[in-house]
Amino acid sequence: LPGGANPMAMLQKMQQDMAEAQESLESETTEVTVGGGAIKVVITGHQRVQSVEINPEVIDLDDEEWLTDLQDLLVAAVNQSIEQSQAMAAERMEAITGGLGDIPGLGGLLG
């Protein structure tokens, strides 16, 4: 190991950094807007939906087809938000582990 570093100390530091990253992801958010501003979804780094905003100016509740479209847009917005949140979390973990989480058997030790 470089500089005679203690592997256990390095592992403990990595675990501590990962715990801190997990904690910060709880308060970090990502935002997705779909349908030309019809729907906005905000989700945390832990994939918890924080808010869903529906813009009443673009919605025609008397149009049955629009209601179906609105449901489809909502599903798309939530799914895109989850994907962005997962990517944000993966980036954070990759920065800490440097890819070590991909080593079989080691991932469980890191978090």
Task: Spell out what each predicted region is.
Residues 2-5, 61-72:
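Residues at secondary-structure transition points
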Residues 66-86:
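Short, well-ordered alpha-helical segments
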Residues 33-50:
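N-terminal intrinsically disordered, cationic/polar leader segments
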Residues 30-31, 39, 71, 75, ...:
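N-terminal hydrophobic or amphipathic segments with adjacent small-residue motifs
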Residues 53:
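Short, acidic/hydrophobic/Gly-rich beta-strand patch recurrent on exposed beta strands
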Residues 11, 47, 74:
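Residue-level signature of catalytic and energy-coupling elements of molecular machines
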Residues 56-59:
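A short acidic/small-residue loop/turn micro-motif
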Residues 1-31, 83-111:
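Long amphipathic alpha-helical segments used for membrane anchoring, targeting, substrate engagement
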